[in-house]
């Protein structure tokens, strides 16, 4: 399998921009590109899919605490592609705590045996770039930097200085650069990049970006590097796929709700269940289904439109009152509350839970955690350890009883504990995002609620 991993020295270096440009340039050459993203991010994967036409897959060694399973998923998705391109997260060695192998990009590179291309920010730097590359190349004896791409380069002369320094003081080849160009900048807001669903003229941006990469990066050399990764010897755990043939699962999918891991959706399909997308923004009612799944997204951006769609509120409430299982994550929790408040405005939501979501100006929760149900819930049985992550600016103010204890640990130490998660009847909602492949029995438990 041909494969490369695009990493960086830190967040904000332009890793995503360079990755998207490479994906576009490779696709323009006629190659089938399979995209991957290290970590739990949903927005970057949507960009990947927009460019390649192929669903991007998250590789997260915290959410899936099984190296063999991660490697098997990587192999499965990449086997039919001409090249697999993995976008890293944060800095190459950044993860959970100070262990360079704990939930980091470098760990995924080693787990998948993928050559690393390091993106270095060229803004206001020249010879010092060589020190960065040399330090990263020496830091982990089990990992070698196979090439470097310089981002935000001011001129050809500027690039020559950086390239000359790196190749004089290190043995890492410089594959090229991306010049400074405001036309390819990706807009950001409170949860990172603005989702593709809310942007216009993306095709033009991708064309410009891909052409810049094709002009200034040695893609032939990059493709040669992609062939140097060792072959994976995969021994995945045996997977018992439950049979839910005939089951209908309605899941919210539109500009307001689109945070889903592709592997989660694929596994639901593998059970024989039928996935039926619906739009809380556009449609009047939930499709006829046995189970309702409302993922995360940006309900706050579309609060007015969501509030006006009263018939959808009534349809979801009716499903809840009939005892149909409803599972909601983050933005889904906000939607199932009684209202959403921001900027002195209040917007009526579905009202399954008596609670108000309030937008704030800072991150309220950020990062990985372990959830433990305090009683049997739709998400899991009492005492089950459930891996997940939270990332939100809102708070949910409610008198509803919490159903989970959540713990954040770092380097073996507990750094934070809190409670969350709400269940009423067969409806469960929390800020937690989860990956089913941590424990595939979760689906059997959740779908089993239809019969309970």
Swiss-Prot record:
The protein, known as: Cobyrinate a,c-diamide synthase
Organism annotation: Listeria monocytogenes serovar 1/2a (strain ATCC BAA-679 / EGD-e)
Residue ranges annotated for the GATase cobBQ-type domain, each copy included: 248-441
Top-level class of the enzyme under EC nomenclature: ligase
Biochemical pathway: Cofactor biosynthesis; adenosylcobalamin biosynthesis; cob(II)yrinate a,c-diamide from sirohydrochlorin (anaerobic route): step 10/10
Catalysed reactions, as listed in the record: cob(II)yrinate + 2 L-glutamine + 2 ATP + 2 H2O = cob(II)yrinate a,c diamide + 2 L-glutamate + 2 ADP + 2 phosphate + 2 H(+)
Marked site: Increases nucleophilicity of active site Cys: 433
Cofactor (UniProt): Mg(2+)
Transmembrane segments: none
GO process annotations (BP): cobalamin biosynthetic process
Keywords: ATP-binding, Cobalamin biosynthesis, Glutamine amidotransferase, Ligase, Magnesium, Nucleotide-binding
């Amino acid at each position: 399998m041909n494969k490369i991993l695009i990493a960086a020295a830190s967040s904000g270096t332009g890793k995503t921009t360079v990755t998207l440009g490479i994906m576009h340039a490779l696709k323009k050459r006629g190659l089938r590109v399979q995209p991957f993203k290290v970590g739990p991010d949903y927005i970057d994967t949507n960009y990947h899919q927009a460019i390649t036409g192929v669903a991007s897959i998250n590789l997260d060694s915290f959410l899936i605490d099984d190296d063999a399973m991660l490697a098997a998923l990587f192999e499965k998705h990449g086997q039919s592609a001409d090249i697999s391109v993995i976008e890293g997260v944060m800095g190459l060695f950044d993860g959970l705590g100070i262990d360079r192998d704990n939930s980091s990009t470098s760990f995924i590179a080693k787990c998948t045996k993928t050559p690393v291309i390091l993106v270095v920010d060229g803004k206001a730097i020249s010879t010092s770039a060589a020190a960065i590359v040399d330090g990263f190349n020496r830091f982990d004896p089990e990992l070698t930097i196979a090439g470097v791409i310089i981002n935000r380069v001011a001129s050809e002369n500027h690039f020559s200085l950086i390239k000359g320094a790196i190749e004089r003081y290190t043995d890492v080849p410089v594959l090229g650069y991306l010049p400074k160009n405001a036309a390819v900048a990706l807009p950001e807001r409170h949860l990172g990049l603005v989702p593709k669903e809310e942007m216009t003229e993306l095709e033009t941006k991708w064309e410009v970006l891909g052409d810049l990469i094709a002009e200034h990066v040695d893609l032939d050399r990059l493709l040669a590097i992609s062939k140097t990764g060792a072959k994976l010897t995969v021994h995945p755990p045996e997977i018992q796929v439950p049979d839910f043939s005939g089951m209908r699962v309605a899941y919210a999918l539109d500009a307001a709700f689109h945070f889903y891991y592709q592997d989660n959706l694929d596994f639901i399909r593998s059970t024989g269940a039928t996935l039926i997308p619906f739009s809380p923004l556009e449609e009047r009612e939930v499709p006829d289904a046995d189970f309702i799944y409302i993922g995360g997204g940006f309900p706050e951006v579309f609060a007015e439109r969501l509030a006006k769609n009263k018939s959808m509120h009534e349809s979801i409430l009716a499903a809840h009152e009939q005892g149909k299982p409803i599972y909601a994550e983050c933005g889904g929790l906000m939607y199932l509350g009684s209202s959403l408040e921001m900027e002195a405005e209040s917007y009526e939501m579905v009202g399954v839970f008596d609670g108000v979501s309030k937008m704030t100006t800072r991150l309220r929760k950020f990062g990985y955690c372990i959830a433990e149900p305090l009683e049997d819930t739709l998400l899991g049985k009492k005492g089950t350890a459930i891996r997940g992550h939270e990332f939100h600016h809102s708070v949910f103010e409610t008198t509803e009883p919490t159903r989970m204890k959540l713990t954040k640990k770092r380097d073996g130490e507990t750094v934070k504990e809190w409670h969350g998660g709400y269940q009423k009847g067969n409806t469960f909602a929390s800020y937690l995002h989860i990956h089913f492949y941590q424990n595939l029995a979760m689906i059997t438990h959740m779908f089993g609620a239809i019969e309970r």
